[in-house]
Amino acid sequence: MQPDLHCRTLAAHTLKHFRALSPLTHCMTNDVVQTFTANTLLALGASPAMVIDPVEARPFAAIANALLINVGTLTASRADAMRAAVESAYDAKTPWTLDPVAVGALEFRRRFCLDLLSLRPAAIRGNASEILALSGMALGGRGVDTTEAALAALPAAQALARQIDCIVVVTGEIDYVTNGQRTLSIPGGDPLMTRIVGTGCALSAVVAASCALPGAALDNVASACCWMKLAGQVAAERSEGPGSFIPAFLDALYHLDMEAANATN
């Protein structure tokens, strides 16, 4: 099954709908990336909410447009709050996205993520090692870093998407987005995106928010990946290193409506 190249014209069209909806996105993410994730969503036009307390997480997940579960700094108490939020989202039919950070390296989070899969995520976003581990095809990875190329994990992603009936995103130099039947590829980005903390986690939040949009989920999620790749390219051209890349990246996301509309395939 050969991946199709995602159309940037469609990504520009999807971004207009995204900004109009401004999805209220409940982010239960890791401590390292909270601010960057919130700023990424705001720059694109979404409305982030970083609600983590168990007492609040359950009711808030039911009223949000989308929910992100990121296990990067997982603890036992946080796992309880996340499970409560996912159960609430499932009951309310709120789409939720799983970011299984380092799932192949640590047993507690692996068991937790596998347990959550029964509650039907709308999307899963991870690097190649994480997707291979979550699918049961391999364990390992070097913490949050991948030891595999994205293309190597594509069969696992396609099988996982069919098994769970969701969208699976494998990120790398080229991102692959699949529903198990159809696969889209999104090239672009820049190596500087791997030299700062949080671009992958922020992408997971944007993927989660995109799942709140009407229409084809595969195209919406692929568009989210395209926005981030394009912003990374633009930011790299305007920055001198990681320190200046971050504000340039947020600016590129903020102005992306014009840049995406003018981009060619």
UniProtKB/Swiss-Prot annotation:
Pathway of this protein? Answer: Cofactor biosynthesis; thiamine diphosphate biosynthesis; 4-methyl-5-(2-phosphoethyl)-thiazole from 5-(2-hydroxyethyl)-4-methylthiazole: step 1/1
Q: Which InterPro entries match?
A: Hyethyz_kinase, Ribokinase-like
Gene3D superfamilies in the cross-refs: 3.40.1190.20
Task: Detail which positions bind ATP.
Answer: R125, T171
Q: Where does substrate bind?
A: M50, G198
* Disulfide bridge map: none
The coenzyme or cofactor needed here is: Mg(2+)
What EC number is given for this enzyme?
2.7.1.50
Main function: Catalyzes the phosphorylation of the hydroxyl group of 4-methyl-5-beta-hydroxyethylthiazole (THZ).
Protein family per UniProt: Belongs to the Thz kinase family.
Its name, as the record gives it, is Hydroxyethylthiazole kinase
Instruction: Name the gene that codes for it.
Output: thiM
